Design a protein with these regions (language model features):
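A long, amphipathic alpha-helix that forms part
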Residues: 1-28, 85
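Charged catalytic carboxylate motif
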Residues: 7-11, 77, 210, 250
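Soluble non-cytosolic domains of exported or imported proteins
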Residues: 2-9, 72-73, 189, 202-206
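Active-site His/acidic residue clusters
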Residues: 36-46, 59, 202, 224
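Long, internal low-complexity/basic segments
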Residues: 53, 166-183, 188-262
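Generic enzyme active-site microenvironment
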Residues: 33
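Substrate-binding rim/cap in mid-to-C-terminal beta-strand-loop elements of soluble/periplasmic
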Residues: 13-21, 42-93, 97-108, 125, ...
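C-terminal cap/loop subdomain of S1 sulfatases and analogous C-terminal strand-loop tails that border
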Residues: 38-39, 86-184, 206
Length: 262
């Protein structure tokens, strides 16, 4: 971990040195941000904070050093910020906003999505507001720990062993159990690790309704493609790549087509 941090620091230093040699440093914005999710369950490929909250640093002309911002920013906001910095008009079709603009209005919410990753078919949506996170799990007949590329990780084997021996506590079984709730609501201010699901808590009924509406509007406005099953071409490509690992029922359709052709 520390070696990775050191190497990253060295590489950023090399980039800055190259910009200075080329006379570009004083006229360049530098964005440094991470990939999504650490190599852990409930992080990589999922919509909890460990999977979607990215650290990001921006430095360059007009940006005061050592500032810390806590407002919501989406990954789709980076491109508009870059275009604006280069003096290029932001196209109207882009949903992102220039979060470096002087007249920028902080986002009221951010939406994130999870569909098929590798061969594992899933459908989850989340709405994040300054205080809450709302998650909608559409495929409730499938556990979070359905077969995936992570199965050979030592930690995956350990978790499955713990599940088989019933060594997991109630909090751990929220993610590693055989079922998942259709809705999850977390108070990020008081529960940053997203352990206490408040979706059925009467005290948070208003917040639940508000976040449901935000998601429903987003799905309608964007024409969320996750509303329909993936195309035969997409499923066939996954099937050819992953073979017998493709165990979700959606693959039965393309397997039948292949069988019919043969």
């Amino acid at each position: 971990h520390y070696d990775c941090l050191l190497k990253t620091d060295e590489q950023v230093g090399e980039i800055i040195a190259a910009l200075k040699r080329g006379g570009l440093y004083e006229n360049t914005l530098i964005f440094c941000f991470s990939d999504h999710g650490y190599k852990l369950h409930r992080h990589k490929q999922f919509l909890y904070e460990g999977g979607i909250q990215m650290p990001m640093m921006v430095a360059g002309p007009g940006i005061k050093p050592k500032q810390v911002r806590k407002d919501l920013i989406s990954g789709i906001d980076i491109a508009p910020a870059c275009l604006a910095a280069a003096g290029i008009k932001i196209p109207k079709h882009m949903e992102g906003a220039n979060f470096l603009a002087k007249d920028y209005q902080p986002r009221k919410f951010v939406v994130a999505a999870r569909d098929r990753c590798d061969f594992t078919i899933e459908r989850i949506r989340t709405v994040v507001t300054p205080r809450y996170k709302y998650l909608r799990n559409y495929l409730t007949d499938r556990p979070f720990m359905q077969p995936s590329y992570k199965d050979n990780w030592p930690v995956s084997k350990k978790f499955r062993e713990m599940m088989a021996k019933r060594e997991m506590n109630e909090a751990q079984l929220i993610f590693f159990g055989s079922k998942k709730a259709p809705e999850e609501l977390y108070d990020l201010a008081n529960d940053p690790h997203e352990i206490r699901n408040l979706a059925n808590d009467p005290k948070h009924r208003k917040a639940l309704a508000q976040h449901r509406k935000l998601l429903a509007n987003w799905i309608k406005e964007t024409g969320d493609k996750g509303q329909t099953t993936e195309s035969d071409a997409g499923l066939l490509a996954a099937l050819k790549r992953w073979g017998d690992k493709c165990v979700n029922p959606e693959y039965d359709r393309v397997r039948a087509l292949l069988k019919k052709k043969n």
